Amino acid sequence: VQSLVNILPSEDAFHQEAARISMMSQMIENGQTGNKKGLGFYRNSDDGREVLDLIDLSYGPAPRLNLTLAEKAEQQGVKHLLKDNGVYGQFAWRVLSRSLCYAASLIPEVGDSPVGIDDAMKLGYNWIKGPFELLDDIGVDFFINRLEAENRAVPTFLLEARGSSFYRVHHNDHGNELQCRLIGGQWQAIQRDEGIVRFTEKRQTIQPINTCAVASWYDLDNIAVVEFHSKANALDAE
């Protein structure tokens, strides 16, 4: 965090999120710095995994949580989690809405399309989907309407996408192509360097040759690609 604080301009919104947290400072002073030290928000002991008490920074038994909401969100998408009115849904909204708003505010300052930001978060921080891909999953209108209901500022690039999305599949004379939204409402085909094909993008423009509950088979330029979508990529009789 401090490295970003040092390099970002003073007017960058990140500074609002980077204020020093006294609890975190105390954890660092205590040596509770993560896995390398064996101490962080969790600690492994002879009695099993322990969790940090956020009040006095001591450790105690880690209770088994009810994961029904998370399991349904995994099946139905992140929007299911954000629509939950409980503490988990509210926490997810507070964290994710700030992150996605910040990403949207960076267009066009750091680039004229969402692709670079999405790639940076996926390749650099191991996100499964980038911020703008998540916004499409959540629903741009749902996201904007909730921000406005909370009297929060809505980034210009996000407002421009109202009633639409940040990515779309467009049909032309050459077939289907994946496009991204640019500032001003224009659309541009996503181009990768020669020899680079991303299946997550290509999959949106083609149909599987065959599919079942556990896997799908695609013909990708005469290359057979099998995508597993079962738990632990397990095969069954199908």
State the predicted function of each range:
Residues 1-238:
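N-terminal glycine-rich phosphate-binding loop for ADP-containing cofactors
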